[in-house]
Amino acid sequence: MSGQPKRLMVMAGGTGGHVFPGLAVAHHLMAQGWQVRWLGTADRMEADLVPKHGIDIDFIRISGLRGKGVKALLAAPLRIFNAWRQARAIMKRFKPDVVLGMGGYVSGPGGLAAWSLGIPVVLHEQNGIAGLTNQWLARIATTVMQAFPGAFPNAEVVGNPVRTDVLALPLPQVRLAGRDGPIRVLVVGGSQGARVLNQTMPQVAARLGDTVTIWHQSGKGAQLTVEQAYAGTGQPQHKVTEFIDDMAAAYAWADVVVCRSGALTVSEIAAAGLPAIFVPFQHKDRQQYWNALPLENAGAAKIFEQPQFTVEAVADTLAGWSREALLTMAERARAVSIPDATERVASEVSRVART
């Protein structure tokens, strides 16, 4: 790249589902010589995580409005205006050639500030149904991309950027070749765990006996309780950990995953090439259900809404999947993944950047 390096400001915050895809794109462009800064909030995960990746971060003050009450709603216009003013001042100093909104409340005032300064705005929607911030920002964005079809009617489907170690896993037909013995079930509840998984899966293990071996990620503070639940059903041999630091290794070990269906989780499971039982988090817009639906439609997964996630239903489903069936599902999952999502998003950022 000749002359001054291109400048990108990534706007993302709140959850790993927003931050990790943004980091993937940021690192890809930094490797090409881009200068990258981040716009976030000081009290969410990006404040600690982003600097650890060698990226400078600026903060604005903004939070969500749902469930905040009448006073908060009345004060919202002033809060949004102040956040917009803060973001605008930050962008006037940094002078980005393009901004990338990856979701979270910070993207709203950040995107509006960029638009008011004539800076191209690129949006990426990670979920199968668009969040309120991105629905609004799509009206002023230069480009809108989506991970799953349906969030925006005319947006290009580019997938979710996922970690390179997951993308580097051997294909299912290589990884699973010659496996025998008990079916390996990976249970993932996220960093906070998922109570319904923690309560149900030990009883599922009791029904399935020695036909399965389970690695159960319980979430913070729940490891002992879940270990006791397995022991209480006569299944103390299963592995329970509070966290899993190396998810790529866990995916490589597993034959099937039982988990929530956050956008990044679904995309990682598809990229790894794994069958799944998805238990969407119950939310009024059914966001996690729509994330998982493409994999179920492809014959790569089974969705259980939480009321249907019973011991009997899950045990019967797992018992009915042979190793041959699981391999077929794994290949279908990999076939619908978009492994070059990071490159696709980065390419669009490069295309629309100011020259």
From Swiss-Prot:
Assigned GO CC terms: plasma membrane
Enzyme Commission number(s) of this protein: 2.4.1.227
Recorded metabolic or biological pathway in which this protein acts: Cell wall biogenesis; peptidoglycan biosynthesis
Subcellular location: Cell inner membrane
Disulphides: none
UniProt catalytic activity: di-trans,octa-cis-undecaprenyl diphospho-N-acetyl-alpha-D-muramoyl-L-alanyl-D-glutamyl-meso-2,6-diaminopimeloyl-D-alanyl-D-alanine + UDP-N-acetyl-alpha-D-glucosamine = di-trans,octa-cis-undecaprenyl diphospho-[N-acetyl-alpha-D-glucosaminyl-(1->4)]-N-acetyl-alpha-D-muramoyl-L-alanyl-D-glutamyl-meso-2,6-diaminopimeloyl-D-alanyl-D-alanine + UDP + H(+)
Record's keyword annotation contains Cell cycle: yes
EC category: transferase
Entries under SUPFAM superfamilies matching the protein: UDP-Glycosyltransferase/glycogen phosphorylase (SSF53756)
Keyword DNA damage assigned: no
Protein name per UniProt: UDP-N-acetylglucosamine--N-acetylmuramyl-(pentapeptide) pyrophosphoryl-undecaprenol N-acetylglucosamine transferase
Entry keyword set: Cell cycle, Cell division, Cell inner membrane, Cell membrane, Cell shape, Cell wall biogenesis/degradation, Glycosyltransferase, Membrane, Peptidoglycan synthesis, Transferase
Binding residues for UDP-N-acetyl-alpha-D-glucosamine: T15, G16, G17, N127, R163, S191, I244, A263, L264, T265, V266, S267, E268, Q288
GO BP term, pick one: lipid glycosylation
Location (main, coarse): membrane
Mode of membrane association: Peripheral membrane protein
Source organism (scientific name): Salmonella paratyphi A (strain AKU_12601)
Family label: Belongs to the glycosyltransferase 28 family. MurG subfamily.
Main function: Cell wall formation. Catalyzes the transfer of a GlcNAc subunit on undecaprenyl-pyrophosphoryl-MurNAc-pentapeptide (lipid intermediate I) to form undecaprenyl-pyrophosphoryl-MurNAc-(pentapeptide)GlcNAc (lipid intermediate II).
GO molecular function: UDP-N-acetyl-D-glucosamine:N-acetylmuramoyl-L-alanyl-D-glutamyl-meso-2,6-diaminopimelyl-D-alanyl-D-alanine-diphosphoundecaprenol 4-beta-N-acetylglucosaminlytransferase activity; undecaprenyldiphospho-muramoylpentapeptide beta-N-acetylglucosaminyltransferase activity
HAMAP family: MurG (MF_00033)
